[in-house]
Amino acid sequence: AQLSLSNVSDEMGTKFLQKSLVAVVFALVLILAYIAYRFKNIGGLTGGMMAVLALLNDLMVVFGTFVLLRAPLDGNFIAAMLTILGYSINDTVVVYDRIRENRGLLGKKASFEELVNHSVNQSARRTIITTVTTVMALGVMCIVSKLYGLDSIFTFAFPLMMGMLSGVYTSLCVSTSAWVAWSERKNAKKN
Protein backbone atom coordinates (compact mmCIF):
# COMPACT_ATOMS: atom_id res chain seq x y z
CA ALA A 1 0.00 0.00 0.00
CA GLN A 2 1.30 3.38 -0.97
CA LEU A 3 0.38 6.49 0.99
CA SER A 4 0.02 9.68 -1.02
CA LEU A 5 -1.12 13.14 -0.11
CA SER A 6 -1.87 15.66 -2.80
CA ASN A 7 -3.76 18.31 -0.88
CA VAL A 8 -1.88 20.76 1.29
CA SER A 9 -3.40 23.20 3.73
CA ASP A 10 -3.08 26.93 3.09
CA GLU A 11 -0.69 27.23 6.02
CA MET A 12 1.61 24.48 4.69
CA GLY A 13 1.53 25.98 1.20
CA THR A 14 2.42 29.41 2.55
CA LYS A 15 5.31 27.99 4.58
CA PHE A 16 6.60 26.11 1.55
CA LEU A 17 6.42 29.22 -0.62
CA GLN A 18 8.23 31.27 2.03
CA LYS A 19 10.99 28.67 2.34
CA SER A 20 11.26 28.51 -1.44
CA LEU A 21 11.63 32.27 -1.68
CA VAL A 22 14.30 32.21 1.03
CA ALA A 23 16.21 29.58 -0.97
CA VAL A 24 15.98 31.67 -4.14
CA VAL A 25 17.04 34.89 -2.37
CA PHE A 26 19.94 33.05 -0.72
CA ALA A 27 21.03 31.71 -4.11
CA LEU A 28 20.82 35.20 -5.65
CA VAL A 29 22.95 36.69 -2.86
CA LEU A 30 25.58 33.98 -3.32
CA ILE A 31 25.56 34.56 -7.08
CA LEU A 32 26.02 38.31 -6.58
CA ALA A 33 28.95 37.71 -4.22
CA TYR A 34 30.54 35.20 -6.59
CA ILE A 35 30.28 37.48 -9.64
CA ALA A 36 31.52 40.50 -7.67
CA TYR A 37 34.58 38.54 -6.49
CA ARG A 38 35.38 36.64 -9.68
CA PHE A 39 35.12 39.67 -11.95
CA LYS A 40 36.34 42.39 -9.59
CA ASN A 41 38.98 43.56 -12.11
CA ILE A 42 36.30 44.59 -14.62
CA GLY A 43 33.66 46.03 -12.27
CA GLY A 44 32.27 42.79 -10.91
CA LEU A 45 29.83 44.24 -8.40
CA THR A 46 27.97 46.14 -11.12
CA GLY A 47 28.11 43.09 -13.37
CA GLY A 48 26.80 40.97 -10.52
CA MET A 49 23.89 43.32 -9.90
CA MET A 50 22.98 43.27 -13.58
CA ALA A 51 23.25 39.47 -13.66
CA VAL A 52 20.92 39.21 -10.66
CA LEU A 53 18.42 41.55 -12.35
CA ALA A 54 18.53 39.35 -15.46
CA LEU A 55 18.05 36.25 -13.29
CA LEU A 56 15.00 37.84 -11.67
CA ASN A 57 13.55 38.23 -15.16
CA ASP A 58 14.17 34.54 -15.84
CA LEU A 59 12.53 33.58 -12.56
CA MET A 60 9.49 35.70 -13.41
CA VAL A 61 9.19 33.82 -16.71
CA VAL A 62 9.24 30.49 -14.85
CA PHE A 63 6.73 31.78 -12.31
CA GLY A 64 4.50 33.13 -15.08
CA THR A 65 4.62 29.79 -16.86
CA PHE A 66 3.51 28.03 -13.67
CA VAL A 67 0.67 30.52 -13.32
CA LEU A 68 -0.42 30.09 -16.96
CA LEU A 69 -0.37 26.30 -16.59
CA ARG A 70 -2.24 26.64 -13.29
CA ALA A 71 0.38 24.29 -11.91
CA PRO A 72 0.78 24.01 -8.15
CA LEU A 73 3.71 25.81 -6.57
CA ASP A 74 5.30 22.66 -5.22
CA GLY A 75 8.62 20.87 -5.40
CA ASN A 76 8.64 21.12 -9.19
CA PHE A 77 8.33 24.89 -8.86
CA ILE A 78 11.35 25.34 -6.61
CA ALA A 79 13.35 22.78 -8.62
CA ALA A 80 12.61 24.66 -11.85
CA MET A 81 13.47 28.00 -10.25
CA LEU A 82 16.81 26.82 -8.87
CA THR A 83 17.67 24.97 -12.09
CA ILE A 84 17.07 28.13 -14.12
CA LEU A 85 19.27 30.08 -11.71
CA GLY A 86 22.07 27.62 -12.39
CA TYR A 87 21.68 27.43 -16.15
CA SER A 88 21.22 31.15 -16.67
CA ILE A 89 24.08 32.24 -14.43
CA ASN A 90 26.34 29.74 -16.18
CA ASP A 91 25.59 31.41 -19.52
CA THR A 92 26.17 34.84 -17.98
CA VAL A 93 29.48 33.77 -16.42
CA VAL A 94 30.67 32.50 -19.81
CA VAL A 95 29.98 35.93 -21.34
CA TYR A 96 31.52 37.80 -18.39
CA ASP A 97 34.58 35.56 -18.54
CA ARG A 98 34.98 36.42 -22.20
CA ILE A 99 34.71 40.13 -21.31
CA ARG A 100 37.49 39.70 -18.75
CA GLU A 101 39.71 37.80 -21.21
CA ASN A 102 39.16 40.39 -23.92
CA ARG A 103 39.91 43.24 -21.50
CA GLY A 104 43.28 41.59 -20.89
CA LEU A 105 43.90 41.21 -24.63
CA LEU A 106 42.61 44.60 -25.78
CA GLY A 107 43.46 46.68 -22.73
CA LYS A 108 42.03 50.17 -22.95
CA LYS A 109 42.05 50.20 -26.78
CA ALA A 110 38.35 49.37 -26.87
CA SER A 111 35.58 51.14 -25.00
CA PHE A 112 33.61 49.07 -22.51
CA GLU A 113 30.66 49.00 -24.91
CA GLU A 114 32.85 47.70 -27.76
CA LEU A 115 34.47 45.19 -25.43
CA VAL A 116 31.11 43.82 -24.28
CA ASN A 117 29.71 43.73 -27.82
CA HIS A 118 32.77 41.83 -29.08
CA SER A 119 32.59 39.40 -26.14
CA VAL A 120 28.86 38.74 -26.59
CA ASN A 121 29.40 38.05 -30.29
CA GLN A 122 32.19 35.60 -29.46
CA SER A 123 30.16 33.65 -26.89
CA ALA A 124 26.69 33.85 -28.49
CA ARG A 125 27.07 30.78 -30.69
CA ARG A 126 28.16 28.54 -27.82
CA THR A 127 25.41 29.84 -25.54
CA ILE A 128 22.69 29.44 -28.15
CA ILE A 129 23.78 25.94 -29.19
CA THR A 130 23.93 24.77 -25.57
CA THR A 131 20.48 26.17 -24.85
CA VAL A 132 18.90 24.81 -28.05
CA THR A 133 20.26 21.34 -27.27
CA THR A 134 18.83 21.40 -23.76
CA VAL A 135 15.51 22.90 -24.92
CA MET A 136 15.19 20.11 -27.49
CA ALA A 137 15.60 17.51 -24.75
CA LEU A 138 13.05 19.34 -22.60
CA GLY A 139 10.70 19.51 -25.58
CA VAL A 140 10.87 15.74 -25.94
CA MET A 141 10.17 15.43 -22.21
CA CYS A 142 7.12 17.67 -22.61
CA ILE A 143 5.77 15.65 -25.54
CA VAL A 144 6.32 12.29 -23.86
CA SER A 145 4.88 13.52 -20.56
CA LYS A 146 1.73 14.75 -22.34
CA LEU A 147 1.38 11.50 -24.30
CA TYR A 148 1.61 9.39 -21.16
CA GLY A 149 -0.24 11.75 -18.82
CA LEU A 150 2.78 12.49 -16.64
CA ASP A 151 1.68 15.90 -15.42
CA SER A 152 4.41 16.21 -12.81
CA ILE A 153 7.09 15.83 -15.50
CA PHE A 154 5.34 18.34 -17.76
CA THR A 155 4.96 20.94 -14.99
CA PHE A 156 8.71 20.73 -14.47
CA ALA A 157 9.95 20.48 -18.07
CA PHE A 158 7.77 23.14 -19.73
CA PRO A 159 8.49 25.98 -17.27
CA LEU A 160 12.15 24.98 -17.37
CA MET A 161 12.10 25.21 -21.15
CA MET A 162 10.55 28.70 -21.02
CA GLY A 163 13.06 29.79 -18.38
CA MET A 164 15.97 28.53 -20.48
CA LEU A 165 14.79 30.47 -23.52
CA SER A 166 14.51 33.56 -21.34
CA GLY A 167 17.92 32.79 -19.84
CA VAL A 168 19.76 32.76 -23.15
CA TYR A 169 18.21 36.13 -24.01
CA THR A 170 18.96 37.72 -20.65
CA SER A 171 22.52 36.34 -20.56
CA LEU A 172 23.42 37.68 -23.97
CA CYS A 173 21.31 40.82 -24.17
CA VAL A 174 19.91 42.02 -20.86
CA SER A 175 22.69 41.61 -18.29
CA THR A 176 25.42 42.83 -20.62
CA SER A 177 23.43 45.77 -22.03
CA ALA A 178 22.38 46.82 -18.55
CA TRP A 179 26.00 46.59 -17.38
CA VAL A 180 27.16 48.81 -20.26
CA ALA A 181 24.35 51.33 -19.66
CA TRP A 182 25.08 51.45 -15.93
CA SER A 183 28.82 51.88 -16.51
CA GLU A 184 28.29 54.65 -19.06
CA ARG A 185 25.91 56.42 -16.69
CA LYS A 186 28.42 56.12 -13.86
CA ASN A 187 31.23 57.44 -16.07
CA ALA A 188 29.07 60.36 -17.25
CA LYS A 189 28.45 61.36 -13.62
CA LYS A 190 32.21 61.34 -12.94
CA ASN A 191 32.89 63.68 -15.87
Task: Give, region by region, the residue ranges found by the protein language model.
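A structural signal for conserved, well-ordered secondary-structure elements
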Residues: A1-N191
